[in-house]
Design a protein with these regions (language model features):
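Structural detector for internal amphipathic alpha-helices that build alpha-solenoid repeat scaffolds
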Residues: 15-27, 49-60, 85-93, 118-126
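Short coil turns that connect the paired helices of HEAT/ARM alpha-solenoid repeats
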Residues: 9-10, 41-43, 76-80, 107-115
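Amphipathic alpha-helical scaffolding segments comprising HEAT/armadillo-like alpha-solenoid repeats
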Residues: 27-38, 63-73, 98-106, 131-135
Length: 136
């Protein structure tokens, strides 16, 4: 999993496309996923983004806990690119378990950054999107 970490200074699309397959795949079946939380606590927005985007492979494997925990940990990030990444991963969780996403949004939508919220509800029907946007 050290390869995507070396890409921190490289193009965002390379990080986003490699993190799930390298770090995320590595973590499937592992109990110790502390590297995700270490990266999420980093002062580097790029390392934080690697942590969040790496969970895409876990999501595809039906494992949502780490994504939800990281989303909560990074809920108040001021970085627009992090808000987009967290919202994107929440949306991916919702594609597989909409009730979990709705439960999360019912709890946190009112305090989520607008960009994060918009990305997470992007695929919702208009009426449901408006409901969550009105909570802000």
């Amino acid at each position: 999993y050290e390869i995507p970490l070396r890409l921190v200074g490289s193009e965002m699309c390379i990080r986003d496309s490699s993190s799930p397959y390298i770090l995320g795949s590595y973590l499937i079946g592992k109990e110790d996923r502390s590297i995700l939380y270490t990266l999420a606590e980093s002062s580097s927005m790029w390392e934080q983004r690697i942590a969040v985007v790496a969970t895409l492979m876990l999501i595809r494997n039906g494992e949502f806990d780490d994504t939800i925990k990281l989303a909560t940990q990074l809920l108040h990030t001021e970085y627009n690119l992090m808000q987009k990444a967290v919202g994107w991963m929440l949306r991916e969780v919702g594609k597989r378990d909409q009730s979990l996403l709705i439960e999360y949004l019912d709890r946190y939508a009112s305090s989520m950054p607008r960009t994060m919220l918009r990305y997470s509800i992007e695929k919702f029907p208009a009426e449901k999107r408006m409901h969550y946007l009105s909570l802000r």
